[in-house]
Amino acid sequence: MEGFVLRKGQRLKTFAPARYRGEGVAGEGIIKDLSLSGSYIIGNVPVSVGMMLALEIFVPGDPELLLIDRATVTWVKRSKFGVEFDILQPKVGERITQVISMLAKTQPRSSRNG
């Protein structure tokens, strides 16, 4: 179906403040879920599909920012949007994995199966 984007990898539900910026755009928002390949964000400044953004994610309980140099906006619905990360540097991928692991340990486990 047109309008649907398949997710690559499991996403971790989270609530992390973030800043994003791109050509002519600078905003703040909340990361609602995070995976190695992308994220779902609620932002205060509109973006467009195809736009390239840089992200600064403030990880709860971690003094070090998670910096994503290149993320492509894949969908937009009002103030909500999805981005896919362009992970070219292994250190960025390692840092995202580290953050996801840390956040997963702090979240309560679901009693649901599957």
What does each model-identified segment do?
Residues M1-L34, S101-G114:
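N-terminal helix initiation/capping motif
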Residues R11, S48-G50, E64, V76:
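Short coil/turn motifs at beta-sheet boundaries
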Residues F58-P63:
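Short, charged beta-turn/beta-strand-edge "cap" motif at the junction between a beta-strand
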Residues D33, V73-K77, I87:
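A residue-level detector for short acidic-glycine micro-motifs
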Residues G29-I31, L67-T74:
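Short beta-strand-centered aromatic/proline hotspots
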Residues E2, G38-I41, I68-D69:
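Short structured motifs
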Residues K80-G114:
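C-terminal output/interaction extensions
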Residues T14-P46, M52-A54, K80-G82:
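Short strand-loop-strand
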